[in-house]
Amino acid sequence: MKKYLWLWWAVCVGHIQAQEVLIKHDVSHLNVIEGKEIERPIEVDIELFKENLLPLQERFYIPLEAKPIIYGYTKRYLSYKWIGKVIGLSDYYFPLFDKKIRQYELPYDIKYLAIVESALNPRATSPVGAKGLWQFMPATGDHMGLKYNSYLNIFYDPMANTDSAMRYLKQLYERYNDWLLAISAYNCGAGNVDKAIRRARTNDYWQVRKYLPKETQAYVPTFLAITYVFYNYRDYNIEPPIFKYQFTDFVIATTTKAGSIKEVAEWYNTPENVFRFANPQILTNYVPKGTIIYALGKE
């Protein structure tokens, strides 16, 4: 019986991989991160995959099931040579995400959605114009309070972008009372999810899924696969790089005068390269007076 179940999974996974839609990532920001890259795709044993899922299913607030499509996307992400660098980078951003998750009383595992959205690139910009760690479209971002000008783009501000994402996700969950549907709506909009629910005549995500746009059909399984990878990467001998700082090590300050990035970094006792990394929202070498910044020290 076990042999036949394995064959069924293999057939399902093969069919899924032939039809899968991949979430595209711009990972150029990872080039500056020193760390060991995966040299060849990692083998993902089906039985180990199922075994590792059991404790997650018990503690995971968002439903995580042992479905072939999730296994398929897990294999895909464990084939990316950069996955270890993203795991390392998460140690820098996740304390910020956890802080905002606590503030808005959301499930902690929602933070893995940012990997799907941007691979933790604070300046990520999609072909359709979505921006930042959590990939806000201009209209949605404007509604959530994200602004920009020639000097600053608050879409790229890690804290502002994350705060807006948590508020928006909370609104979507309150609308659907189902995290998989809320996550789908984050990707394709509530209107498309509502339409899919009407066509499916149910609000069960796995039955609604086939009526969603193609990319959104891949979105939730990708999120669940990434969650699995982040919880179990040690089992696959992935060695993420270690960062010296976390985003929450920086204090929030408002500049009292204008200056160059180099000058402002010196005023706030922060190495220039660290200051630039912590403040991707600053677009030029000029920092206007009254700019909210993140620094290691006070002026």
Model-derived features: where do they sit?
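Bacterial Sec-dependent N-terminal signal peptides
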Residues: 1-23
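Extracellular LysM carbohydrate-binding repeats and other cell-envelope/extracellular binding modules
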Residues: 211-212, 274-299
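Catalytic and binding regions of secreted/periplasmic enzymes and modules that target cell-wall glycans
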Residues: 169-196
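An acidic, Gly/Ser/Thr/Pro-rich helix-cap/linker signature
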Residues: 15-105
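Short, functionally critical alpha-helical segments immediately adjacent to catalytic or ligand/cofactor-binding
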Residues: 106-123, 182-187, 275-279
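Substrate-binding/active-site groove segments that recognize
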Residues: 128-150, 162-165, 169, 193
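Primarily a LysM-type cell-wall glycan-binding module
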Residues: 241-269
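Solvent-exposed, acidic/flexible segments
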Residues: 79, 83-94, 103-106, 126-134, ...
